[in-house]
């Protein structure tokens, strides 16, 4: 059932691979519909965080309402929902897509289809969206729009003959894109009289309004004063304000089925208004929630410690503030003998981890040390209990472990065919299992591998880029767990275990990794007045050793000639002193040492 009002609404999002010009296209659409005056136009209007603008990526989903007047005089309300493009934020993308009826697939005319173009496109198809291909960057001399159209038809299988050819940078043919949205994206439907059902596709904390939920009303209507209930948490709130984004907040009287807007209800914490949850009325609630909700599950863990131990409380407050805005971030206190008090934090992926670290340093001015990232291992102990291990230091002794499993991801790598050998070589080095490969066209190949998450967690992406001169693109999703023969590698300095350097590695690689780490640390740790042995150990067995030689004073400088026994006495005395020093001396480990451990030798 569709009302007259709904016929003039279009809800759509823009999906693309990183850097194909998604946020710039959004800017042009905002400009072309006159949503903001020229003075207010700022590049990448929808990327609010400084970090987003700097890295040129979108991290949080955003929404904006555009009013488009056709030449025929009809007025359409277009709700644009801008989504993050990075694989770490896949769940957020899928929720944003669930709020739409259509998606603009932006493809770079010079690059063609890349791994995330496909991944995001399939996400859109899973949500039954109408896909409108738009080919961008046609002002570049290397653009090849006709070939790219053909590629879209062959690889994705959607009609692309009349895809608008635009340049988001110069604003060329933007009107064609707007017309395509109106003509191809279906109008929303949904009964305005039915009980309220609204999907939260983003939520964040505002210091004045509390938590602001971005919602898409699927059925019913919501207005100020309505008592609402969140279906997954069962909590009840009273609506304080509803409105739409122009990109700034503009309060309205009510939002009805088909509308996209925001609602505030003095909710204190983002965790209570999870992305993907369903809002309904407390008095007249819907029978079932909208499908597809799942809590955010962290995949990568890392320890974060303040360089200055006194800043522990500040770090805790900073993490709490970030968590208010980022439901996917989890943290719990932990202590390390080497680093003192800190937190074990869980992230969606590496980019997410990187961004959180950068925000801690930038927005909160904290100096932090981060330990090597690790994943969740599942361990079945000999007595039958199952534990999940996120920190290598807590690994039980080998005699207690019956079975150990590690997470496996399904990864798709799209690369120019010249580099297939290099990519396969890299994937095999990282314990990848080859699944299949298909040629997308004469020059590009898609390779599918199953790789342990542990192997791609740190620098797989960098290695892939350097082997393919930056041409390959990569996308992954977790598919499950598989048993593996893993051991814990410890590093001992001066015979003390440095817990923050411990890591879990496959048994057959332990020796090489231990040797490598010992050599790296030898280069990085500064010389002391006494000799420092660096040892790598698996259990009680030492598998590699390097020694940092002591600095020594020339005690014989003042002896000119003379008796050998006098010299011997001085040397013996020096030796004794060094021995004593070594018993009481402690070794300072510089921050670079923690970083060096992560860099694996290719």
From Swiss-Prot:
Gene3D superfamilies: 3.30.70.240, Elongation factor 4, C-terminal domain, Elongation Factor G (Translational Gtpase), domain 3, P-loop containing nucleotide triphosphate hydrolases, Translation factors. One of its GO terms (biological process) is positive regulation of translation. It catalyses: GTP + H2O = GDP + phosphate + H(+). GTP binds at residues 19-24, 136-139. Keywords: Cell membrane, GTP-binding, Hydrolase, Membrane, Nucleotide-binding, Protein biosynthesis. It is found in: Cell membrane. Its EC number is 3.6.5.n1. Residues 7-189 form the tr-type G domain. It is a peripheral membrane protein. GO terms for cellular component: plasma membrane. It holds the Pfam family GTP_EFTU. SUPFAM superfamilies: EF-G C-terminal domain-like, P-loop containing nucleoside triphosphate hydrolases. The keyword Nucleotide-binding applies. GO terms for molecular function: GTP binding; GTPase activity; ribosome binding; translation elongation factor activity. It comes from the Bacteria. Transmembrane segments: none annotated. Belongs to the TRAFAC class translation factor GTPase superfamily. Classic translation factor GTPase family. LepA subfamily. Required for accurate and efficient protein synthesis under certain stress conditions. May act as a fidelity factor of the translation reaction, by catalyzing a one-codon backward translocation of tRNAs on improperly translocated ribosomes. Back-translocation proceeds from a post-translocation (POST) complex to a pre-translocation (PRE) complex, thus giving elongation factor G a second chance to translocate the tRNAs correctly. Binds to ribosomes in a GTP-dependent manner. NCBIfam families: lepA, small_GTP. This is Elongation factor 4. It comes from Clostridium botulinum (strain Hall / ATCC 3502 / NCTC 13319 / Type A). The gene is lepA.
